[in-house]
Amino acid sequence: MSKPAVKSVPSATAKTATRAANPRQKAKAPKQAKPEGKGRAKPSKDKPRAEIKKALHPRNAHLNGYDFPALISAFPRLKTFVRPTPYGALSVNFADPLAVKTLNAALLKHHYGIGSWNIPEGALCPPIPGRVDYVHYVADLLAEGDKSCAMDKARVLDIGTGANGIYPILGCQVYGWQYVASDINAHSLANVQSIIEQNPVLQGRISLRLQPDDKAVFKGIIQAEERFELTLCNPPFHASMAEASEGTKRKVNNLQLNRGSSVKAAPKLNFGGQAAELWCQGGEGQFLATMIRESQMFADQCLWFTSLVSKQENLKPCYQALAQLNVDTVKTIEMQQGNKITRVLAWSFQSAAKRKLWRAEHLAR
């Protein structure tokens, strides 16, 4: 299995480990570089890899694709949407929102023990393999090769959980994490609450909080004396509803062309998500800038801040902002699912020594 490309960035850490050890299995611990000192933005000598293998995280349950017979057995309603492809394999029409939602429900039931999952029309329907990849990589980030790290003691904050609640669901079921999930949309949180109530395995493990200020990220959510080992976020991608609609149309067109047909009707936005899930003023770049600025206020309450970054051009401004905040360590993890590349940007105000002490105090077995 090839390793994911992990690039060090202008930060206090010269190199990053490609993969941290899974606390539940034996693995070779990565070498840790000594911090170069807070506040520095020395360019790394690491060279980016020329090629990123088209593979999911080694612990990803979807590494070898979808087992449709098993999924249909677990969730019979999926059978209606499964068709053979021209190449002889089984698949669903990924341009059909109902087909994608039904596939997600089957995946969550078969692989993660979630018996009931649903989202309202218009809500973002997340690709499960890519979402759980993020969860696995930040689990590695948290462990840093420490085999004594008790993952089920970790407290995690999900910023912008949406109506699907996918990161809390996956984090709870894969690693036993305790979650706080926030959103600016009360209707989205109500749907996540309904999912929790219908699945006893999630009850008592996910706390929902409404963000009263749509311009804030952590403020109003993280409470005094509260600690989190990780924060996760999938920021709104677009800067306007018009841009979001165009992105949805383009995505559906590409899917239809891949299937050898053309779009005969306007694509439904429920393929892409609700307004707050899709766009915000200033788009992804502005959202990340706000997140980075606010993270300094909670530097001693969160061990690792992380976020997905979809647009590569947004990385440089993030690095520059982090370099001005006395951040100790910055890491960028590149993930690839098929032809799509996404990145996890992670930063910590704690030194490697302090992170080790944090794990010993809060995550010891």
From Swiss-Prot:
Q: Which CDD domains match?
A: AdoMet_MTases
> Pfam families annotated for this entry?
Methyltransf_10
EC category? transferase
Compositionally biased intervals (Basic and acidic residues): 33-50
Q: Where does the chain cross the membrane? A: none
Q: Which family does it belong to?
A: Belongs to the methyltransferase superfamily. METTL16/RlmF family.
NCBIfam families according to UniProt = PRK11727.1
- Relate the protein's function as given in its record: Specifically methylates the adenine in position 1618 of 23S rRNA.
What's the name of the protein?
Ribosomal RNA large subunit methyltransferase F
Q: Which organism is it from?
A: Shewanella baltica (strain OS195)
